[in-house]
Each structure stands twice: as C-alpha cells, then as structure tokens.
Regions:
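Short, small-residue-biased leader/transition segments that mark boundaries at the very start
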Residues: 1, 5-12
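Generic beta-strand/beta-sheet core signal
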Residues: 3, 69-71, 94-95, 116
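Structured loop/turn residues at beta-strand edges in well-structured enzyme cores
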Residues: 6, 62, 87
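Terminal amphipathic helices with adjacent charged low-complexity linkers/tails
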Residues: 10-26
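A structured beta-alpha segment of the ubiquitous adenosine-cofactor-binding alpha/beta core
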Residues: 24-80
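Adenosine-phosphate binding glycine-rich loop
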Residues: 83-197
Length: 197
C-alpha cells in the first residue's frame, strides 16, 4: 500500500493554541488548503516536502511527545517506530486503519510507549455515523454540540472498556489487547443472546 512518505508534513516547534488550531481547521475544512500554508503563515513551524524514500519516513525521526499516524495503512514500520522511541515519544495514537505495522506496535510495547490502536482511538468516525443514523431514524436534529457531547461519552466508554479489560486479563496498559478482548467479548455476548452459540 502507499505510504505517507508520499506526503509532505509540518513540524511544530512551538505549542499550538486555540487560534492556530482554528486557523488550521478553517484552512482544511473551508478553504481546502495545504498544510504548507500554515507553515508559511506562522513562525515556529517547519514544512518538509515529500521525499520518495521507500520504507523510511523522516517525519518519525522527530523529537515529539505524541505521534498521531493518520494517513494510511502501514505508515509506521518497526524501524520508524524505533526512531520515535529513540526520540523519547511518550504516546502513539492511531488515527487511521492500522497505520502501524505489527513490528511497530511490538516496538512501542517493548519500550513502554503508550499505544492506542485505531480500533479504539479512531472509532469517532464510525461512532458519529451511528449517531447520524440514530438521529435520522428518530427524525431529530441534534446540534453540533449535542453530537459532540454524545461522541465524547462514547469515546470515554471505549477507553474505559479497553483499559479495564486489559487490566482484567493481566495486561495492564496494553490497549491493543484490551480493545481486542473487549471487542471479542461484545461479539460473543451478542451471538449468545441471539442463540447462535
């Protein structure tokens, strides 16, 4: 599959505040602009053009506290995960479908990096679609704030389930195991309730 090395990226050397976040949201949601415009507009931001280096993306060789791979499947491989570890990353949260290879996930776990798998951390889109279907079937019109409040509750519950399930099954802090086991149990319970098992 294609990798995010095909895409440029920005590195923030100063914190992002509400004003800058609003500017980015307007750029992406309304103006449909490119992130380079953000780097051109604000100080403390470095833009790096795409580099066609297969299987190695310099983005991940950056000193960051949190990494959010959100572009595509297999975005971070084991070598790139090690670059993040070497740069003392604290947490990685997937924002796409399996952007981290199994080797990358293993590297994060082996080095004590908090890792949120996409099936949990990237569930907001699916949850919002479910809320939209509920809203439509009820012939209701929720405000953006109401949808956001409902989504927040769903995401808090997903975190709680993954966290508590990992602890219950002897793997505290392993959100991959917690999310997988919690998901399996939910499906198994539904199958039992339907008399399928």
């Amino acid at each position: 599959p294609p990798r995010s090395t095909l895409f440029p990226y920005t590195t923030l050397f100063r914190s992002i505040d509400r004003e800058k976040l609003a500017w980015i949201m307007d750029l992406k949601n309304n103006r449909r602009g490119r992130i380079k415009e953000y780097a051109d507009h604000f100080d403390g931001v470095e833009f790096t053009a795409s580099k066609p280096e297969p299987n190695l993306n310099g983005l991940w060789d950056t000193n960051v506290d949190i990494a959010l791979p959100c572009a595509t499947q297999n975005e971070i491989n084991g070598e790139e995960a090690q670059m993040l570890v070497d740069n003392e990353v604290i947490a990685v949260a997937e924002g796409a479908n399996m952007p981290c290879t199994p080797e990358a996930v293993e590297c994060f776990h082996a080095n004590g990096v908090l890792f949120a798998p996409g099936k949990a951390s990237n569930a907001g889109g699916v949850a919002t679609s479910g809320l939209e279907m509920s809203q439509n079937s009820l012939r209701m019109n929720w405000t953006r704030e109401e949808v956001d409040q409902k989504l927040e509750g769903i995401m808090i519950n997903i975190h709680k389930n993954a966290f508590e399930t990992a602890e219950k099954y002897g793997m505290p802090g392993n959100y991959v195991a917690g999310a997988n086991i919690a998901g399996f149990l939910k499906v198994a319970e539904a199958m039992q309730a339907q008399g399928m098992v």
